[in-house]
């Protein structure tokens, strides 16, 4: 589960390495986020020469969580880390590469570009 003040690793090459969650989008009473949720975050660590800088406020989509997710076929998947991919306002990724596996649940949303860039979809 992702909530306010959670720190997530960034799974793309946009220049950010770690982000801190400011808000989970999707209504006024949303307290926690899971895979596929869009968040507003600030960049806490960044690599030099990247697209985004430290302190920038960005939008991101959660692609991996330690908490995991239940699937309709009865299986359960969880990851070793919490990670997100930075996105633009049109839900396209800011980076050109995605690192690490992502969950299949992103396929049904508006994130097919992220799914196609990912090296592994679980």
From Swiss-Prot:
NCBIfam families: rplN_bact (TIGR01067). GO terms for molecular function: large ribosomal subunit rRNA binding; structural constituent of ribosome. It comes from the Bacteria. Keywords: Ribonucleoprotein, Ribosomal protein, RNA-binding, rRNA-binding. PROSITE patterns: RIBOSOMAL_L14. The gene is rplN. GO terms for cellular component: cytosolic large ribosomal subunit. PANTHER family: 50S/60S RIBOSOMAL PROTEIN L14/L23 (PTHR11761), LARGE RIBOSOMAL SUBUNIT PROTEIN UL14M (PTHR11761:SF3). Belongs to the universal ribosomal protein uL14 family. Binds to 23S rRNA. Forms part of two intersubunit bridges in the 70S ribosome. This is Large ribosomal subunit protein uL14. The keyword Ribonucleoprotein applies. It comes from Limosilactobacillus reuteri (strain DSM 20016). GO terms for biological process: translation. Part of the 50S ribosomal subunit. Forms a cluster with proteins L3 and L19. In the 70S ribosome, L14 and L19 interact and together make contacts with the 16S rRNA in bridges B5 and B8.
